[in-house]
């Protein structure tokens, strides 16, 4: 009887593990267009939503998207609230101390500065500027390291808040991913412009997973390798980033 009970318990554990692998819970912010955002219909949309669905189709898993605010997005992963982060998160050494990353699914791409058109800001020798960044990002770390001594770094909970405060004149410049700033400039009616040199920080964007989830990491990497090879990733980049790339294949 004891052996039967133990066997049943073991089967239950295996069944639970199998069921867990049938669903891929993807943590995302839903506030960082065109990577991930809530559309007019109140649904999650964007590059990473489509890519997540492509990964699930390739692996035979079912996608479940879980929204999280940006600041606690890594702690929520570690706590088990979802299985992988897909939220425009750059691969950095600091983050790798806490979590692992898949291979990148968006190549390293420059960050850029944005300001009111004609503001005439000298970002090479800035002084007294109010520089807006989204908190806990690679841009925030760069701004603190390079500009905090002579300028005020203003941290925002979301990218959209930083742009709103720039438009309202509450900050002088915003530093963010160029891929996210492109549509902002395009839709500003000429009120905003990108300027200054490209800022290369981060090692591309990848999916964050818990350190112990090595099998899941391997599964996701296999899927991404296949989706790059068959052109799916490049097609989604072209769709969501105005055909501008960067791409994995020529």
Model segments located where?
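Extracytoplasmic small-molecule ligand-binding "clamshell" domains
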Residues: 21-88
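Short helix-initiation/N-cap motifs at beta->coil->alpha
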Residues: 49-50, 65-75, 135, 154-168
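A ligand-binding cleft/hinge motif common to bilobed small-molecule-binding domains
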Residues: 72, 87-98, 144-145, 172-201
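Periplasmic-binding protein-like
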Residues: 107-114, 182, 186-221, 243-250
């Amino acid at each position: 009887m004891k052996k039967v009970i133990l066997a049943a318990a073991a089967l239950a554990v295996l069944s639970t593990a199998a069921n867990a692998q049938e669903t891929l819970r993807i943590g995302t912010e839903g506030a960082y267009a065109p990577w991930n955002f809530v559309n007019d219909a109140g649904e999650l949309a964007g590059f990473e939503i489509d890519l997540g669905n492509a990964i699930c189709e390739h692996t035979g898993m079912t996608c479940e998207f879980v929204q999280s605010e940006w600041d606690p997005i890594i702690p929520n992963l570690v706590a088990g609230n979802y299985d992988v982060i897909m939220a425009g998160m750059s691969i950095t050494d600091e983050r790798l101390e806490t979590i692992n990353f898949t291979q990148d699914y968006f190549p390293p791409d420059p960050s850029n500065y944005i300001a009111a058109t004609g503001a005439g800001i000298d970002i090479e020798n800035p002084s007294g500027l109010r520089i807006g960044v989204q908190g806990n990002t690679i841009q925030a770390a760069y701004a603190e390291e390079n500009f905090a001594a002579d300028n005020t770094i203003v941290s925002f909970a979301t990218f959209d808040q930083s742009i709103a405060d720039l438009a309202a004149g509450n900050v002088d410049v915003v530093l963010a991913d160029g891929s996210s700033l492109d549509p902002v400039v395009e839709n500003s009616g000429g009120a905003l412009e990108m300027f200054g040199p490209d800022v290369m920080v981060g090692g591309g964007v990848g999916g964050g997973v818990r350190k112990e989830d090595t099998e899941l990491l391997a599964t996701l990497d296999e899927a991404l390798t296949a989706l790059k090879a068959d052109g799916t990733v490049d097609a989604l980049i072209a769709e969501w980033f105005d055909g501008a790339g960067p791409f994995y294949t020529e």
